[in-house]
Amino acid sequence: MHPFYTRAATMIGEIAAAVSFISKFLRTKGLTSERQLQTFSQSLQELLAEHYKHHWFPEKPCKGSGYRCIRINHKMDPLIGQAAQRIGLSSQELFRLLPSELTLWVDPYEVSYRIGEDGSICVLYEASPAGGSTQNSTNVQMVDSRISCKEELLLGRTSPSKNYNMMTVSG
């Protein structure tokens, strides 16, 4: 099988988790119809898959992490904005529906988020790489590399985090 198709197949779960998380904000506020939500979700999945297709490295999950990061920080992430335009949501409406500060990391085998600059990092989705007898050592390496990925992104902060707690959210 061609390496790209293998990589693309591995990002389906991660993208679905990220899109579901963002869509829940729209659903919770009740300002969009179910059909609009489906269109938004499908559009965002397609946009993310296209955006990530040359920046997805299951063998090195941290590689490309900054590129794949979805960020709302008083500016709307452009991919979320494009998906919202397809259902007729204005930027102002979108800002009312989503947190003003949101970071969503979409990495191979893990999707995590932080709301607010000083919020805790929460894990939305976790998967193990397909492997044989070395699975336990692979998982240990992955945990270390996931944390270092996020630490690298947090290094540019202007204020230190009040809390840096990892917690798993199961759905």
UniProtKB/Swiss-Prot annotation:
The gene coding this protein: BTG1
Clinical disorder: A chromosomal aberration involving BTG1 may be a cause of a form of B-cell chronic lymphocytic leukemia. Translocation t(8;12)(q24;q22) with MYC.
UniProt keywords, alphabetically: Chromosomal rearrangement, Phosphoprotein, Proto-oncogene
GO biological process: cell migration; cell population proliferation; negative regulation of cell growth; negative regulation of cell population proliferation; positive regulation of angiogenesis; positive regulation of endothelial cell differentiation; positive regulation of fibroblast apoptotic process; positive regulation of myoblast differentiation
Protein family membership: Belongs to the BTG family.
Subunit structure: Interacts with CNOT7 and CNOT8.
Gene Ontology molecular functions: enzyme binding; kinase binding; transcription coregulator activity
Species for this entry: Homo sapiens (Human)
Role: Anti-proliferative protein.
GTP-binding among keywords: no
Name of protein: Protein BTG1
Source species taxonomy: Eukaryota, Metazoa, Chordata, Craniata, Vertebrata
One cellular component (GO) term of this entry: nucleoplasm
